[in-house]
Amino acid sequence: MILLSAIITIGAFVYWVSLVQSDKEVTGLAEFVPLILLAPFVLAVLIRFNYWQVIGDAVEVTENQFGDLYAQYSDIAAEMGLDKLPRLYMGNGNGVLNAFAAKCTVRRSFVVIYSDLLDLMYEHGDVNGVRFILAHELGHVKLKHVAIWRFVVNVIPEYLWIGRSVTRAQEYSADRCAMHYAPEGASSMMALYAGKRLYRRVDPIAYFASFDDHKIGFWARASNLVSTHPQGHRRMRALWAMQSEGLDHHGRML
């Protein structure tokens, strides 16, 4: 990515200089060449700024800080064959159950898991559930969902109103990755929809049946279409199906 940025920057600079030195009026797309020159630098600055905005209020997980969690995390990353272990941070969820992967530099990634999700492991003894979450986020890294080139390419789907379909597909892919490396924790994803205290009390058969009673029509599809993640019942149904049908099962997009 750095090499590509350098090539684009140098090419744009040479083109801009040739236009300026000529007597031709600079119009059209040529007017945006200075912005193209600045784009790689601006992107690098934004990545670092966002990284410090996040980790400034977080706790880094290391061998000496939540060592048992770090061991689970590093083991999964090693199984995935990741060349570099992304830094892991615990953020205060303030009641929100979430985790995400992002860039900390142009070439390196990091993962954040909220403290409320870690309650599954530390308060309820659900180590497998947390392993699944960690595998899901590392799956995003392994599948290069946080790569810079994807960020650039995803601009096009956004303009075509299909950007969120791309992110939903990525969530399904990361779930399949997690199913491969930590399948025992798949059912714990119900915590995202029933909460960290009651998720184990949810009967999956009754849960799916309650949605089967509804006709999946226009409004259900429209709601799913504008979501960055698959709706809970679709995501859980896909995970449930993968447990019996294998990783080739794909969740519904529309």
Question: What is each PLM-predicted segment?
Answer:
Residues 232-240:
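Amphipathic alpha-helical oligomerization/assembly segments
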Residues 105, 144-165, 205-233:
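Alpha-helical membrane-targeting segments
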Residues 1-96, 252-254:
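Hydrophobic or amphipathic, alpha-helical segments that drive membrane association/targeting
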Residues 135-153, 183-186:
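Catalytic Zn2+-binding segment of zinc metalloproteases
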